Amino acid sequence: MTDYCYPKAKRLLKPAEFKPVFNQPLFKVHQTHFMAFAYDSDHLQARLGMAITKKKIPTAVARNTIKRIIREQFRHTHAQLPALDVVFILKKSTKALSNEQMRQEISDILSKVISKQRRATAADVKHKDK
């Protein structure tokens, strides 16, 4: 059975944990409203960080809704995610989006993270074989 909890071990909490993700990302995944940075983690499981700014989303209620949706999608796909640190940022306002549209965009990003990491891992294996 899959563990759907979201303990502190699965979160990026300190600025020092966010810094390498932003400065040296393994890759980035773009969508219309969101962007995710992925960094190869030393941890055994994927960890999530969020940088949802007041400048893009002025109300706390809206920011918290976005964070809740990101956390929920992360929890449901965590089992498939490789050991990466993933940080979500907001590219532009989500006022025009419904919660379902946000879920879909975030889910698409997480799917792309999984496929990009698999391709990168497969490429590493090919280079080691040569």
Curated annotation (Swiss-Prot):
GO biological process terms, semicolon-separated: tRNA 5'-leader removal
Family under the similarity heading: Belongs to the RnpA family.
Oligomer and partners: Consists of a catalytic RNA component (M1 or rnpB) and a protein subunit.
Reactions catalysed, as given in the entry: Endonucleolytic cleavage of RNA, removing 5'-extranucleotides from tRNA precursor
Organism the protein comes from: Psychrobacter sp. (strain PRwf-1)
Protein name listed in UniProt: Ribonuclease P protein component
EC numbers, comma separated: 3.1.26.5
Transmembrane segments: none
Keywords, alphabetical: Endonuclease, Hydrolase, Nuclease, RNA-binding, tRNA processing
Coiled-coil stretches: none
Keyword ATP-binding attached: no
The UniProt record lists the keyword Ribonucleoprotein: no
The protein's enzyme class: hydrolase
Gene3D superfamilies hit by this protein: 3.30.230.10
Family matches, as Pfam families: Ribonuclease_P (PF00825)
Function in brief: RNaseP catalyzes the removal of the 5'-leader sequence from pre-tRNA to produce the mature 5'-terminus. It can also cleave other RNA substrates such as 4.5S RNA. The protein component plays an auxiliary but essential role in vivo by binding to the 5'-leader sequence and broadening the substrate specificity of the ribozyme.
Gene Ontology terms for molecular function: 3'-tRNA processing endoribonuclease activity; ribonuclease P activity; tRNA binding
One of the record's GO cellular component terms: ribonuclease P complex
